[in-house]
Amino acid sequence: GTFVREHHGGFTRWETDVTPFVRPGKKNEIRLEVTDRLDDISYASGYAHHPIGGILRDVTLFALPETCLYDFYAETHLDAAYEDAVLKIGYSSPVAGGAEVAYTLTEPSGRRYPLVQSRFPLEEGGNMNELPVKNPLKWDAEHPNLYTLTITLSKDGKEIGRFDRRIGF
């Protein structure tokens, strides 16, 4: 076998691309090893100072088309007056050529929010898009207003992927 990557931080999500190691039409085997060393445990709180051991979360293997988005995240930033916001969206892509990303923002009521700009060309590598949102409904424990951000990836005018994220301002 071939070592692909190492990840430190057992409680953080991570992904890795195994495409270069897959042999189409042949038997492929993926092995995941967990090392939980007692001498590598933080004693920050003095509580629960013991090895955890094993895989505690789901492990998912998924296939993506060559033109795709990964490491997607969305952040909301409110202005100093706590009135208007900017929705900052980041992601990466291994390939770009002729692809674009389109966004739809749906209010908690189900009404589509009118975005000033909703389509962006997909660039190879890291991408960052900013969507200004005027006076969005705010999220708090008593008013859990969540918007739905729909992300659509298209290439040469044809939709090749779509997913949603729930967003609070």
Regions found by a protein language model. Name each.
Residues 2-169:
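Secreted/periplasmic carbohydrate-active enzymes, especially glycoside hydrolases
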